[in-house]
């Protein structure tokens, strides 16, 4: 039995006090949530402290909260911030646990079957287990997740029902406990004691939960009764303290009991017989043979081990769902009355909408050619309307909310005053005729003041031509294109901030990590060419890149004024007017954001006599040296993850993959 703690409130700790229009935004959001409003939008300009506002709202409404970001990097940043704001509450991190993932696929044109290949990050797997166990044990939980939270996860009821509950004085034999641990996918390992394992020494059983990485538990028996339970350091075995109640959750999220397993296997066999009959009637003998061989092997593994590689493809049968029914996801682990916050909602909601179709197209091919049973199609992400059915109350957070969010609610709460007093930039519209010379003059003014410039173009050719022209004119310039690798991208941004070069040219400068306070000029070429990066939302986001410097200025080069341009200019002017009035009324002088310049990722290179840290030229390395570099990077990646620096860990991961591809 799980005793759920529901009496502990969220306790926000921060040296900041709400300022600007944060108090009004916080009050409005809280009042609307407590008044039962289902959906609302927090329209927060860049740099206005949206995460702090979100934290204030969570602490006041006191509901379990799911915060969804559109990629791992942003989720990692938010997780770090929420951990600082709520040190005494359960702040959890739930993203895809794959460092590398090649999904199972089949390409009929070349008759190529691509097996599923993946590398699981043990640290993230631990954090996922920590998230689900926290949700079942307590209410003061914030889970920061990527869109992987809408993928199938296994039944929360089975997960909770399978949990092993232990107390001192409880009558249970040692062997019964060992059998229960094996049933929930724990492995016995008396030598290498790690997550998801247990070891036995006489009347003492030591268990290492899947949600921990340093502390394990020691269960001491006296006959067929538990004498005491202690929390211990997993490495030294040193006792930390005694425990009154221990709940051990399964070591995998896909778990079922023996009775359900036999029922599931019977359903899998029935579906297999049906699909084999279909293939044989259509003369697809190869597909039939392939399907029989694969499925019968999986059934044998399920019978003997209770698990098989790719068990999630049978999740419909394991969960007892009907064909087409949505899978269980992280959202099902939350209680009914929970709060969802969608960060950068204009990006995240688009991802939630698109996940289902891509997944189905790939899996349908596997089903058609006999690699999987049709029920594998039900191991999938949620459709958007299925996601909506889980929503009790939701806050969309964005500087530029999308059409979907706007269609869901008329309640829009603005937050456009920055704590630093910074204003949205002034905008000039200039003709494209003579734009090169005009731009050169503007760049030279910034160089003289030791400031930087962003230039965004629409085509690769335009970017390359402009780069060549500016180089000929003596400007220190770089072009950041889509082929630039992760580490190079970080290096380019760092060099721009340090003044190694003064101008950065790109097509899409809206991605995360491109906020540079030293940038005082953003030039938008072809501003009148309507499209993804020149619509109102794209323009406002691009304009925001100049909002971190007190001298921020935007120039749009265009031959006509489009509706998108006019709306973006009007919105920026409206915000600027409000910001100026606020600063004047409160005597605030705007100041450029101060942001530390982070060092480059470096790795240790071993020489015969010493170890020196230096930047590496990977291209010129031998295969053996590259292998050493990969090992060193993997170690540093783990260290970064343990320190909760997921942005750095993600960069390490991408670099490791690039190095592996060189061989």
Curated annotation (Swiss-Prot):
One of its GO terms (biological process) is SOS response. It is found in: Cytoplasm. It holds the Pfam family Helicase_C. SMART domains: DEXDc, HELICc. GO terms for molecular function: ATP binding; ATP hydrolysis activity; DNA binding; excinuclease ABC activity. GO terms for cellular component: cytoplasm; excinuclease repair complex. It comes from the Bacteria. ATP binds at residues 44-51. Residues 435-601 form the Helicase C-terminal domain. The keyword Cytoplasm applies. Residues 31-418 form the Helicase ATP-binding domain. Residues 627-662 form the UVR domain. InterPro entries: Helicase/UvrB_N (IPR006935), Helicase_ATP-bd (IPR014001), Helicase_C-like (IPR001650), P-loop_NTPase (IPR027417), UVR_dom (IPR001943), UVR_dom_sf (IPR036876), UvrB (IPR004807), UvrB_inter (IPR041471). CDD domains: DEXHc_UvrB, SF2_C_UvrB. A motif (Beta-hairpin) lies at residues 97-120. PANTHER family: UVRABC SYSTEM PROTEIN B. HAMAP family: UvrB. This is UvrABC system protein B. It comes from Streptococcus pyogenes serotype M6 (strain ATCC BAA-946 / MGAS10394). The gene is uvrB.
